[in-house]
């Protein structure tokens, strides 16, 4: 809603240019000619992430976004292991890239930079 506003989001959904699919409903799908954004991936189990990633079809891009420090599924997150699995040169040769943001990348607010830095040591 920040980028397109609510009317813009509704128009994109109605035009079927974007689609929101809960993880429970991706089984059996193949994402061809798509850009798939998986947000809050730290709250998905390894099994759920595997289910999503194995829907990868032709001419598609997947963007998986997560913060291991913000998982709320009590140690069951699959995000860290999946990230580490693809954080290497062989994955890069296949066109799979990973990166991490640091505290310097925070743009939400200056106070948040301070808070995140303090929380790193907790």
Regions inferred by a protein language model and the residue ranges of each:
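Conserved helicase motor core of SF1/SF2 NTP-dependent helicases
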Residues: 1-38, 42-122
């Amino acid at each position: 809603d920040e980028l397109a506003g609510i009317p813009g989001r509704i128009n994109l959904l109605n035009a079927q240019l974007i689609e929101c699919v809960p993880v429970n409903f991706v089984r059996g799908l193949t994402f061809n000619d798509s850009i798939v954004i998986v947000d809050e991936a730290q709250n998905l189990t390894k099994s759920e992430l595997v289910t999503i990633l194995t829907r990868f079809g032709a001419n598609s891009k997947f963007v998986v976004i997560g913060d291991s420090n913000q998982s709320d599924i009590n140690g069951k997150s699959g995000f860290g292991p999946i990230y580490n699995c693809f954080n290497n040169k062989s994955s890069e040769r296949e066109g799979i890239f990973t990166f991490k943001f640091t505290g310097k990348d925070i743009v939400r607010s200056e106070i948040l930079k301070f808070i995140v830095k303090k929380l790193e040591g907790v």
